[in-house]
From Swiss-Prot:
Active site per database record: C334 (nucleophile), H445
Family designation: Belongs to the CobB/CobQ family. CobQ subfamily.
High-level lineage: Bacteria, Bacillati, Bacillota, Clostridia, Moorellales
Pfam family, one: GATase_3
UniProt-listed HAMAP family: CobQ
Protein name (Swiss-Prot/TrEMBL): Cobyric acid synthase
Length: 517
């Protein structure tokens, strides 16, 4: 039977996902077969497994940290918000419908508990250690009766719980004490320790507070993890984009503007771009903030028609088309690709009651939404022309697709040709081009994770500014692995690994054996 440890938080966004990834890497480096698990995840950042299932991006990264192939059992329930108080429900990698919050939490989630149990039982048979991540807070009284993500999961797994608090936002001690007070006595016993996360400052000054916390709660503080703003791992949800609107995420010589759609999804598509030196990437949700960037990207969306209407109301459609008319490059990914076309049809009301809407008319495609959903890992080759794709013709790219509907090319050549979809050999066109190749779009998420393509995009933007190509550009996959080791090393140095091993009943001590420099 697998050993388990569960991370629960005093609230959302306290850093559970990142700490879970760190623990997965620590256990992996100690020679254990380890798997992540999150029973229910609400996020718009998702990915495709090798067998074509959809799961939360955070658990995919945690699986990478654990050195294993991601499986939908690691995240059996995924909720993807489509509008206010409504979400698409994904169960074991497949969509089962859209539900409102009241309907889902009222009774539907209880029907899914057996799927959670089955998924965990599978992982328990396959792995030695399971790192479980909770959702939100275990003390949400209004949802507690029907919750399937926190203490109920801990009981099922027999997992000791570590309660994580974010001290950077303030009130961490009160959050810990308050959370424990609101738990039932039998739940409180399950909490084996406390982790204070995102600390910056003098630890000696914090020590009296830690002593108080241990005395007041009777729970040991297993570690104080430093604030790690540059951990470089994909973030789970768009809450991390709050406060960055209209501002740059860094300084650089070329400027890229990503439109921050209300239902933006898979903004992890831009993680590699943000990591490149000399790139200034910023998120924009007002026409007045768009300015004159070197490149505009329309990202994926969980509500393409709704976000297109928003784009129009904000004046961003006009601003983007004016930039395109002046020669500014435009890229669309998935929902953003659909928006760049001539029109979008939704005859079966997959997204909204709007059956047809005009697009930005910057790409020669028409899109028709369908009830079936494509979720696949894909490989293909570049077929497009123009400055961005022309020099790469014939080169292989890879990524994944997650979309409902199909786009039909009306003129010109496709940007890519898919040669493998979900492990099956295929020959399928993907994407479109216009404006002599300056404007292009694709359904392939992660397209900019491909080093050669991303480097070509940046080199073209630099050349348009009269700047030389930058040597030594990023190897994104190697960088992700390096940053996982750095993260795990930082957590290992500030966490009592001996006490953690004892809490879990491990037979051998935990040490850090990674390469974190």
């Amino acid at each position: 039977m697998a050993k388990a440890i569960m991370l629960q938080g005093t609230s959302s966004n306290v850093g559970k996902s990142v700490l879970a990834a760190a623990l997965c890497r620590i256990f992996h480096r100690n020679g254990y077969r380890v798997s992540p698990f999150k029973s229910q995840n609400m996020a718009l950042n998702s990915g495709a497994t090798p067998d074509g299932g959809e799961m939360g991006r955070a658990q995919i990264v945690q699986a990478m940290a654990a050195g294993v192939v991601p499986r939908v059992e690691m995240n059996p329930i995924l909720l993807k918000p489509t509008a206010h108080a409504s979400s698409q429900v994904i169960v074991l990698g497949r969509p089962v419908g859209n539900l409102g919050a009241r309907e889902y939490h009222g009774h539907f989630n209880q029907k899914l508990w057996s799927r959670v149990e089955e998924a965990y039982a599978f992982l328990e048979r396959e792995f030695e250690i399971i790192v479980i991540e909770g959702a939100g807070s275990p003390a949400e009284i209004n949802l507690k009766a029907g919750e399937i993500a926190n203490m109920r999961v801990a009981r099922m797994a027999g997992a000791p719980v570590l309660l994580v608090a974010d001290i950077d936002r303030g009130g961490a001690l009160a959050a810990v004490v308050g959370t424990l007070e609101l738990l039932e006595p039998e739940e409180r016993v399950m909490v084996a320790g406390i982790i204070i996360n995102k600390f910056r400052g003098d630890l000696d000054l914090l020590k009296p507070a830690l002593d108080f916390l241990e005395s007041r709660t009777g729970k040991p503080v297993l570690g104080v993890i430093p604030f790690l703003p540059d951990h470089g791992l994909p973030e789970e949800d768009s809450v991390v984009l709050e406060g960055v609107t209209g501002r740059s995420t860094g300084a650089g010589e070329v400027e890229i503007a990503v439109i921050k759609l209300p239902c933006i999804s898979n903004f992890t598509d831009f993680d590699a771009l943000e990591r490149e030196k000399g790139v200034n990437l910023r998120y924009v949700e007002a026409a007045s903030d768009l300015g004159n960037p070197d490149l505009v990207i329309l990202p994926g969306s969980k509500n393409t028609i709704g976000d297109l209407l928003w784009l129009r109301c904000q004046g961003l459609e006009t601003a983007i088309k004016e930039l395109a008319g002046r020669g500014t490059p435009i890229i669309g990914i998935c929902g953003g690709y659909q928006m760049l076309g001539k029109e979008i049809r939704d005859p079966e009301h997959v997204e909204t009651d709007v059956e047809m809407i005009k697009g930005l008319d910057l790409l020669p495609i028409k899109t028709v939404f369908q009830t079936s959903k494509a979720t696949n890992q894909v490989r293909g080759v570049v077929t497009g022309s123009g400055p961005f794709l022309g020099p790469l013709q014939g080169q292989e790219v890879q990524g994944y697709e997650i979309h409902m509907g199909a786009s039909f090319l009306l003129d010109g050549r496709p940007a890519f040709k898919i040669t493998s979809r979900g492990g099956r050999l295929v020959t399928l066109d993907d994407g479109a081009l216009a404006g002599e190749g300056r404007i292009w779009g694709t359904y392939i998420h992660g397209i900019l994770d491909n080093d050669s393509l991303r480097h070509q995009v940046i080199s073209v933007l630099r050349a348009r500014r009269g700047l030389p190509a930058r040597p030594g550009m990023l190897n994104f996959m190697a960088e992700q692995e390096r940053r996982l080791d750095i993260l795990a090393g930082e957590v290992a140095r500030h966490l009592d690994l001996g006490r953690l091993a004892a809490i879990m009943g491990l037979e051998r001590p935990l040490v850090w054996t990674g390469h974190d420099n």
